[in-house]
Amino acid sequence: MSKYISEQFRKYVAERANFQCEYCHIYQEDAFFPFHIDHIISLKHGGLTILENLAYTCSFCNSFKGTDVGTILFPKQKFIRLFNPRKDSWSAHLEIDDFVFYALTDIGAATIKVLNLNEVDRIIERRTIARN
């Protein structure tokens, strides 16, 4: 299937997410850079350009995620998939306290790792947004 995402799909995905990144939960209006439509399972891995495989993402989450679908977690040395906004409950895998993300599951840990959710600059960004 084509990697082209129609304007109709883009609008639907953004509205479905309430204009909020489906990974880090930052709102589009608070972000400096434009948001993206992400293939949850990338085309490279056989994902399709269908609504069930599209997520609304901030530029940082989209960039860090790339075509990844998971990662190896140590010390278990086990492949763990990333959080899937269409199939998973965010609060079942992740929580945030004082602008820092905490994993509740291996899926949460994999997502924090790959998306660099606790990178210092990202924590500072969340704190700055909260003050405004």
What function would you assign to each model-found segment?
Residues A31-F35:
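A short coil-to-beta-strand element that immediately follows conserved catalytic motifs
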Residues I40, H45, F74-K76:
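Short edge-strand/loop segments of extracellular domains
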Residues I26-Y27, I40:
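Histidine- and/or cysteine-centered catalytic micro-motif in compact active-site loops
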Residues N18, H25-I26:
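A positional/architectural concept
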Residues Q8-R16, G47-E52:
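Short, flexible, mixed-charge glycine/proline-rich loop motifs
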Residues H36-S42, C58:
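Histidine-centered catalytic micro-motifs used for acid/base chemistry in nuclease
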Residues M1-Q8, Y12, Y27-D30, S63-N132:
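Extended charged
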Residues C21, H45-K65:
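Short beta-strand-alpha-helix junction that forms the catalytic/metal-binding core
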